[in-house]
Amino acid sequence: MSEISKEYNFKEVEEKWIERWDPSVYYFDWGSEKPQYIIDTPPPYPTGNFHIGNALNWCYIDFVARYKRMRGYNVMFPQGWDCHGLPTEVKVEETYHITKNQVPREEFRRLCEEMTAQAIERMRRTITRLGISTDWSNEYITMKPEYYVKTQRSFVQMYEKGMIYREDHPVNWCPRCATAIAFAEVEYDTRTTTLNYMRFESDHGCLEIATTRPELLPACVAVAVNPNDERHIGFVGKSVKVPLFDYEVPVLSDPAVDPSFGTGVVMICTFGDKQDVRWWVEHKLPLRQAIDREGRLTEIAGKFGGMSITEAKKAIVDEMLSRGIIYRQEPLEQNVGLCWRCKTPIEILSERQWFVRIYPDVIIKTADEIEWVPEHMKLRLKNWTGTMEWDWCISRQRVFATPIPAWYCKRCGEVMVAKEEWLPLDPTKTQPPVSCSCGSNEFEPEEDVLDTWMDSSISALHVTGWLSREDPRYPAQLRPQGHDIIRTWAFYTILRSMALVGVKPWETILINGMVLGEDGRKMSKSLNNFVIPEEVFEKNGADALRQWAALGGSPGSDVMFQWKEIVAASRFQQKLWSIYRFAAPFASDTDAPFTQIDRWLLGELGMLVSKVTDAMEAFQFDEAFRAIRAFTWEVLADDYIEIVKSRLYGPDSDERRAAQATLYRVLDVLCRLMAPFIPFITEEIYTSLTGKSVHTQSWPSLETYTSPEGALIREIAAAIRRYKSERGMALNAPLSGIEIYTELELETFDLRGVANAPIQLRKGQPEIESRAVAVKPVMRFIGPRYKDQAGKIIKKLTSMDPADVERMLASGRVEIEGAEITPEMVEIVRETLSMGEAVDVLRLDRATLLIRRSS
């Protein structure tokens, strides 16, 4: 065996195995008879780098994938890329200082595709460097025709089932991105705004209203009061004039009006929020659209038309203040809906869009058929589903996304949706091969594209072979994902799977948390708490980062990144390497009868295998790896190896060969247990030990070993080491001898080495006596009480026979130089004797030790 370096070189080891590993080992075998385990891997947006949050999630997935392979499953761990959508478009616009409307449609898409391809290549490198066992044979890229043809076919199938429709409806709109977005894509933030109090005049007096959106005055279609609010109920059924814009609107009563907010009177605009939409529908109000797709006021705003929302708000407020219409202003903290990508406040516009029908009962029923880890995360989906009021808006006014396969007849306006056999296609490039029902052959293409969630929500169907294989394998076994996209990716995937194939998408959904910086806040470059995986790779290696992921917390909980945990992980790897370096020359796959301490260790190892297996089945990675660490450091290194060192260094014997065989077996099993977590160092150790790859081995199982004698030997060895340490002795310091009194028949050869002393094993209990040998005055009690007399008292006490002092204290009174001495003022030093010789006694539950020190 070549010499093993003292220090573990993670860079050398990790780079070596990245070069040597054959990725085909991880490929899914469609013809295998093994039970399948298909993972619906999250396809990240390839817009930047593979960040630390991705690393956490992919570590979780890899722990499962490697474990399941070792348990005999045919595992598919594919890698997908969710290319389309706003993230890439926004990045292109920022990078090239353009908007989607400033360059030809095809040129803008080309820029998006190029940027996406570059990001995918960067992220692939990081995934590989992290040691992820990806099945690259099942990689998918949603911007490629072979994937988005399935998105288009799913659109056509759902349209033909009546689950997709097109109509005018209020939608969330981002003025900056100039596109509709779904409610699930709206983020909320608390912002300080201004509540403006103003007067709406009428022939019956004025009605005072408070609003934070004066720029929506030209969109006002009614004013509402609570029917139980006696202050304003007299205005109901009458009209008031909208200030500045001089048109009348009716005053309505509605129980949804909050009498305690502002003046208790609200203006209903089309649209300020979802409540406005409810009132608009319920009261059959007219539509006045004051804001256009670009976030500018329309012509109904008169002289304010063409202004941006911000400009118009300021101009309208300034004029109303100058005319005395606004009579009061006050700050207000308000929850504002924002575009999930660019953080621009959203508007609600009435637009003709494409929608998917939502069936909440079906989604909730299906969610109940899926195992959720942790279970409480299911409530997030149920709560979100229970609040759904509108169907899913799936059309987007962008470029880089799956084209909606539809056209509009120029003559009659009829919608023509493509047939499945025509797909894939882009309607802006391809005309339908058939005429319209009216006989016309002239069509306008649908230029809107699909929401990117229409791509990723069929990922579970795609990886299980839907539309591409005659033997699709749905449902998948696992969906791992973050809790932040339960209301989007999880929700939409369940919806689409049930709509398209009537089967739940997966058997289990595993939820991971978010990664926080060391300050406990969300990671952000602006907060200077941002860490990238490559920084950890360079300083400590991939295995250290994977340990942090395993130990960071249980699934579902947010995880704080801490460099001290990375450093601790590196220390553990060095400890593991040191164990291997010590054991390698001795470890041997040989047959020999195990000794008591060997059987004890194998029993502990068996319990570890059971504990880790249970934890892995429950996705409790922290429990699994914490148990492995504790066993490796405390049981194997601190206990067993220290106990058997003398046996290993001794001459050849059955006992020595038993220790060698035990070390071999323990290293073999430990490497297999740790392989899903730290694949690099375990591969290095295992191949050196066995000549085989640990990642092609099965999960360990052990016969049951029990050895109460071995457990007692470990306890005695620990007591002897503790005894020496407490007395400042070297652990290899010799002792004159040790007598062990116990009812168990112990093997003593290892204890002789631990104690560096002859060992005598005896039955029963030792015959010992105790005597007082010295008196130690306690100055902290004597000094303060007797002050100047203290010296004489102490001198007298130390000159007395300790046995006499002890007897006098037992009688309740000692008087010296006229001073009363109480028990707390004196410590009696005793020694224990056995057969007239001084000994130290160590009492354990199942044994008593008499220790004779060296003279």
Swiss-Prot record:
Keyword Ligase: yes
TM region(s), chain numbering: none
InterPro entries: aa-tRNA-synth_I_CS (IPR001412), aa-tRNA-synth_Ia (IPR002300), Anticodon_Ia_Val (IPR033705), M/V/L/I-tRNA-synth_anticd-bd (IPR013155), Rossmann-like_a/b/a_fold (IPR014729), tRNAsynth_Ia_anticodon-bd (IPR009080), Val/Leu/Ile-tRNA-synth_edit (IPR009008), Valine-tRNA_ligase_type_2 (IPR022874)
UniProt binding sites for ATP: K525
The entry's keywords: Aminoacyl-tRNA synthetase, ATP-binding, Cytoplasm, Ligase, Nucleotide-binding, Protein biosynthesis
Compartments reported by the entry: Cytoplasm
One Pfam family recorded for the sequence: tRNA-synt_1
Residue interval(s) of motif 'HIGH' region: 44-54
Cleavable signal peptide: none
Cited PROSITE patterns: AA_TRNA_LIGASE_I (PS00178)
Keyword Flavoprotein: no
Known catalytic reactions: tRNA(Val) + L-valine + ATP = L-valyl-tRNA(Val) + AMP + diphosphate
GO molecular function: aminoacyl-tRNA deacylase activity; ATP binding; valine-tRNA ligase activity
Family to which the UniProt record says this protein belongs: Belongs to the class-I aminoacyl-tRNA synthetase family. ValS type 2 subfamily.
NCBIfam families assigned to the protein according to its UniProt record, in alphabetical order: PRK13208.1, valS
Free-text comment about domains: ValRS has two distinct active sites: one for aminoacylation and one for editing. The misactivated threonine is translocated from the active site to the editing site.
Function: Catalyzes the attachment of valine to tRNA(Val). As ValRS can inadvertently accommodate and process structurally similar amino acids such as threonine, to avoid such errors, it has a 'posttransfer' editing activity that hydrolyzes mischarged Thr-tRNA(Val) in a tRNA-dependent manner.
Protein name according to UniProt: Valine--tRNA ligase
Lineage: Archaea, Methanobacteriati, Methanobacteriota, Stenosarchaea group, Methanomicrobia
